[in-house]
UniProtKB/Swiss-Prot annotation:
Record EC number: 2.1.1.172
NCBIfam families membership: PRK09489.1 (NF007023)
A GO MF label: nucleic acid binding
Family indicated by similarity: Belongs to the methyltransferase superfamily. RsmC family.
Name of this chain's protein: Ribosomal RNA small subunit methyltransferase C
Organism whose genome encodes this protein: Vibrio vulnificus (strain YJ016)
A GO cellular component entry from the record: cytoplasm
Gene3D superfamilies per the UniProt record, alphabetical: Vaccinia Virus protein VP39 (3.40.50.150)
Domain of life: Bacteria
The encoding gene: rsmC
Length: 340
């Protein structure tokens, strides 16, 4: 069984495309194929918005790795290897941002699972040049093309979606980049959580902050709290920072792979935990969030989360805290609470 994802396996079949190239890898890359690629190329650099993946690859000396919502560094790459992301809007964003950096003449290879909508590259790339499919395997597709026009300059501010919410009389302006959970809209789970939250005090962590809706609401309604907001996704961090700024609010926003970079003395941990990874359902992060929460709360600490009611979170919370209460419930979502 291969250690590589299916998109990497189809790229591995076509190594001749990469020989002698300076390759920039971006998108939904999840494995260590870039290390093998480095053996066939002049250079390999990886741009990722996923902090967990960045932590996995940043220690390897044969590649250069970057984490962020946009690539700030200069690049000598002449070939972009794009792993198709789950959100079409994120693919558009990555193409606009990275091709503006690499310029006309840059080659592109796109790999992705067919169910992810990778076929969309055929139409999406027309603004830059031509791209064609050259291989199919493992329910994936391999495209090659070349940018033959000078891409427009990239301005991240143009890519934010803006929307307003009003809960309990609190009016908030939300800023959201492509690739962020519930991009450009207010999800019903978070709404139920905000309607249920008690008054807060002390040091509060918004875990998996997304576009910053929960953190901004908590800061506006409880102006004396010490707010921290973390996420694994760089687009979420940039969105949360923009949301706080748009509402004149203060908070520390930082990257964390679950609890990798968090404190251990929170009065409250508040979350709408993620349970999707790429195209698949993945409970690992949420289970670690819940199971290890007591280690990151102070002696009076409390955990409050919203979750789809079908998810079996109460037993995990009960095991970690020896208590779990349901504060609110609809036919789709539940609000769970636990005391340390």
């Amino acid at each position: 069984m291969s250690a590589y994802t299916a998109p990497s396996q189809i790229a591995q079949r076509q190594l001749d495309y990469f020989n002698g190239k300076h390759v920039l890898v971006a998108g939904e890359v999840e494995d260590l194929f870039p290390l093998e690629l480095a053996e066939h190329c002049e250079s390999v650099s990886v741009f990722t918005s996923n902090y967990s993946y960045f932590r996995q690859i940043r220690g390897h000396s044969t590649i250069t790795s970057y984490f962020g919502s946009q690539l700030e560094a200069d690049s000598q790459a002449d070939l972009l290897l794009l792993y198709w992301p789950k959100a079409k809007a994120e693919a558009e964003y990555l193409l606009a941002m990275l091709l503006a950096k690499l310029g006309s003449g840059c080659e592109i290879v796109v790999v992705g699972e067919n169910r992810s909508g990778v076929k969309s590259i055929e139409k999406m790339f027309q603004a830059y040049g031509t791209v064609n499919k050259y291989d199919s395997a493992r329910r994936c597709s391999f495209y090659w093309g070349q940018c033959n026009t000078q891409p427009n300059a990239f301005n991240q501010a143009d890519w934010f979606r803006h929307y307003s919410i009003n809960i309990h009389g609190q009016q908030l302006e939300i800023q959201s980049l492509p690739g962020v959970f519930s991009h450009g809209e207010f999800d019903l789970g978070s709404q139920l959580l905000l309607e249920t939250l008690p008054s807060l005090s002390g040091k509060v962590l918004d875990f998996g902050c997304g576009a910053g809706v929960i953190g901004a609401f908590m800061a506006k309604r409880n102006p004396t709290i010490e707010l921290e907001m973390c996420d694994i996704n760089a687009y979420a961090l940039a969105s949360s920072e923009a949301t706080l700024a748009a509402n004149g609010l203060q908070g520390r926003v930082f990257a964390s792979d679950i609890y990798s970079d968090t404190a251990d003395d929170y009065r409250f941990i508040i979350s709408n935990p993620p349970f999707h990874s790429g195209l698949d359902t993945n409970y690992n992060a949420a289970e670690t969030l819940l199971g290890q929460a007591p280690q990151h709360l102070n002696n009076q600490g409390e955990l409050i989360i919203v979750a789809n009611s079908f998810l079996k979170y109460p037993p995990i919370i009960e095991q970690a805290f020896s208590n779990c209460a349901t504060l609110n419930k609809t036919n789709k979502f539940s609000i769970y609470h636990a005391n340390k």
